[in-house]
Curated annotation (Swiss-Prot):
It comes from Schizosaccharomyces pombe (strain 972 / ATCC 24843). Residues 1-139, 197-201, 248-271 are cytoplasmic. Component of the yip1-yif1 complex, composed of at least yif1, yip1 and yos1. The complex interacts with the ER to Golgi SNAREs bos1 and sec22. It is a multi-pass membrane protein. One of its GO terms (biological process) is endoplasmic reticulum to Golgi vesicle-mediated transport. This is Protein transport protein yif1.
Amino acid sequence: MPPKLYHPQPTHAIPVSNMRVNTRYEPTAGFSGTSVPSVQAANPSAYLPNSATAQMGFQLGKNAVNAGQEYVEQNFGKWLSTTRLHHYFTVTNSYVVAKLLLIIFPWRRRSWARKLRRSEINGSAEGYCPPAEDLNSPDMYIPLMAFTTHILLLCALAGLQDDFQPELFGLRASKACAVVLVEFLATRLGCYLLNISSQSQVLDLLAFSGYKFVGLILTSLSKLFEMPWVTRFVFLYMYLATAFFLLRSLKYAVLPESTMAINATITSHQRSRRIYFLFFIAASQILFMYVLS
């Protein structure tokens, strides 16, 4: 029979302070055993000198932003609204190809009248069809892409001639924007003096002023042949094609004959003046294209 074991008993009293138990739970980070200090959420208002003053400042800033948005919407919303811009960028691949061929070979086109979008309820005209549904409708996609391609192509040709500089991008782009702006303002002034007004006229004029870059791209590409007579021939042909294209395309705006025109009824004297103005727009393309080439 094994002997009985006796455990030693403490012979002195244990202080109460050493028997204190920490009842607060502190989470550990992973398996390292280190405690993660508790972080209290910061109060943003504690850092502000006066919360009432800050709220007043925020409210004034919000009111100023809302007033600015309302002013822009009232004065420029009718030209630069999202709905109108979406109309000019509603294109398809087949439309882009057909439109480029129309700009280069406008002589083959027979009908230049724009299609009207009819209401499904009473059949009344609600506006013009988007470019994807009407080849004669102006768009913003081709002018913007042609503008960008024209700038890049000129810089690339300068690089082939060891004459490229980084500043050339800005110079070419600024020059092209200035020419387009001058043409747009001159055309807009002529429309104002002749009392020519139609819906979405501003965006239409901007779109038509950018189609000339298609001919300028072909003119720049012809320089790769290093034969001056080829470049002159391409430039002259593209000028005639662009002028004829604008002459037929702008007719619906300058000489309104549809129900979408605001002032469709004009006298014979006004009509003759508008025809001269239309030919002036077409003839002036040779000057703008020469400056940009």
